Amino acid sequence: MKGLIGRKIGMTRIFTDEGISIPITIIQVEPNIITQVKSIQTDGYYAYQVTTGTKKPNLVIKPEAGHFAKAGTKAGRSLWEFRLKHEEKPINIGEILTLEYFTNIKKVDITGTSKGKGFSGTVKRWNFHMQDASHGNSLSHRVTGSIGQNQTPGKVFKGKKMAGHMGNKRVTIQNLDIIRIDLRKNLLLIKGAIPGAPGNDLIIKPAIKLSH
């Protein structure tokens, strides 16, 4: 198995026996139900597809309803896929994956969607230095400045840092410590901050690059 889907609840802190404050993010990991198993023969690669949570019946479109019915499960919030390098131990449709998977894992990689900040200037978006506040400067305090040269090359280079939509992007944070696991309440307590607003879905995987 490669990972699970969870939902960000929010942040708080806990104290160690020595009185040290640790900032933590609380993630609710409801049971993940396998809805499809893919193989080289049928799909060209190995993977398993999961769903979690619930969705109002009036929001489930017919293709989704048929897919969930074929898997013998209720409609979940969405569908996620975890690709496998090779065929692992048998995974069955309808099988339930729980937080117990992480009981012997100390570090995880978590992927989420960062908070959207709307259209932002270069000072906020890229941490550009502001121009002079006075000394003849007028109306150009937060202006980007030059974005290129002249006739040669006669263009703005691709990737130039400029104003634009900030946030609302897929972000992965690696090597996050697992502080505590509550199997009874399906809660995963992670040290530090995680991208996204409370309520966002998160992809949780065992750390691929363990730090020493």
UniProtKB/Swiss-Prot annotation:
Any coiled-coil regions, as ranges: none
Region (Disordered): 139-161
Modified residues (N5-methylglutamine): 151
Mod. after translation: Methylated by PrmB.
Database matches in Gene3D superfamilies: 3.30.160.810, Translation factors
GO biological-process terms attached to the record: translation
Composition skew (Polar residues), residue ranges: 139-153
GO terms under cellular component: cytosolic large ribosomal subunit
MF GO annotations: rRNA binding; structural constituent of ribosome
Keywords (A to Z) from UniProt: Methylation, Ribonucleoprotein, Ribosomal protein, RNA-binding, rRNA-binding
Pfam family, one: Ribosomal_L3
Quaternary structure annotation from Swiss-Prot or TrEMBL: Part of the 50S ribosomal subunit. Forms a cluster with proteins L14 and L19.
Task performed by this protein: One of the primary rRNA binding proteins, it binds directly near the 3'-end of the 23S rRNA, where it nucleates assembly of the 50S subunit.
Similarity field: Belongs to the universal ribosomal protein uL3 family.
Protein name according to UniProt: Large ribosomal subunit protein uL3
Source species taxonomy: Bacteria, Pseudomonadati, Pseudomonadota, Gammaproteobacteria, Candidatus Palibaumannia
